[in-house]
C-alpha cells in the first residue's frame, strides 16, 4: 500500500510516523510546499526505522506530485491554522484554495484514491474535495470527528 500525506507540519509528520511505524503502508510520501521541509521530516522519520523496527519507506518532496502516483490513500493536512481574530469565513476562503489545488494535483497522478481530509474547517474542506474531485462519496472521508472524540476522552 502507498499513502501520501500532503502537509508535513505536526499533524502530517505524526501521521507519517504512525503509518510507517505500524507498517500500515510500505511507502509513505510526505509532500509540502515549503522548500526542504518534507524532505527533512522524512529523513528524521526514516532514521528512527532501525530503533522502531519498521521497513516502510518515507519519502519527502517539495511540491513534486509525480511522487504521489499510485497512492491508495491521500491524507490532506495542508492549510493554514486559524489565527486570532480570523473569522471562519476567512479561514474557509484561504484553505479552500489550498485544498482545491491539492485535490486537482493529486488526481493528475492518482485518479481514484481514498482521500482522508484533516484540513480545517474539516467538514467544509471534505465537501470541497468531494465536489472538486468528482470521486465517489465513499472515497472522501473527513477525519475531524475522531480527533474531537479522542480529545474529549482525554479530559
For the regions a language model picked out, list residue spans one by one.
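Rossmann-fold dinucleotide-binding core
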Residues: 78, 117-155
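Rossmann-fold NAD(P) dinucleotide-binding segment
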Residues: 66-115, 125-128
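Generic hydrophobic/aromatic pocket-lining and core-packing "Φ" positions
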Residues: 16-17, 103
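N-terminal Rossmann-fold NAD(P) dinucleotide-binding loop
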Residues: 12-13
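Glycine-rich Rossmann-fold phosphate-binding loop(s) that bind the pyrophosphate
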Residues: 8-9
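Conserved N-terminal Rossmann-fold NAD(P) cofactor-binding segment
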Residues: 33-70
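Extreme N-terminal starter segment of soluble prokaryotic enzymes
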Residues: 1-3
Amino acid at each position: 500500500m502507498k499513502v501520501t500525506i500532503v502537509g508535513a507540519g505536526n499533524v502530517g509528520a505524526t501521521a507519517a510516523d504512525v503509518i510507517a511505524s505500524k507498517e500500515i503502508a510500505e511507502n509513505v510520501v510526505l509532500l509540502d510546499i515549503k522548500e526542504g521541509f518534507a524532505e527533512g521530516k522524512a529523513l528524521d522519520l526514516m532514521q528512527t526505522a532501525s530503533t522502531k523496527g519498521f521497513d516502510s519507506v518515507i519519502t519527502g518532496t517539495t511540491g513534486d506530485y509525480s511522487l504521489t502516483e499510485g497512492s491508495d490513500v491521500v491524507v490532506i493536512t495542508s492549510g493554514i491554522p486559524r489565527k486570532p481574530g480570523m473569522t471562519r469565513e476567512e479561514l474557509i476562503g484561504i484553505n479552500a484554495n489550498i485544498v482545491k489545488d491539492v485535490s486537482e494535483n493529486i488526481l493528475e497522478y492518482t485518479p481514484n484514491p481514498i482521500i482522508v481530509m484533516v484540513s480545517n474547517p474539516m467538514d467544509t474542506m471534505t465537501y470541497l474535495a468531494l465536489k472538486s474531485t468528482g470521486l465517489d462519496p465513499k472515497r472522501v472521508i473527513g477525519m475531524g470527528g475522531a480527533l474531537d472524540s479522542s480529545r474529549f476522552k482525554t479530559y
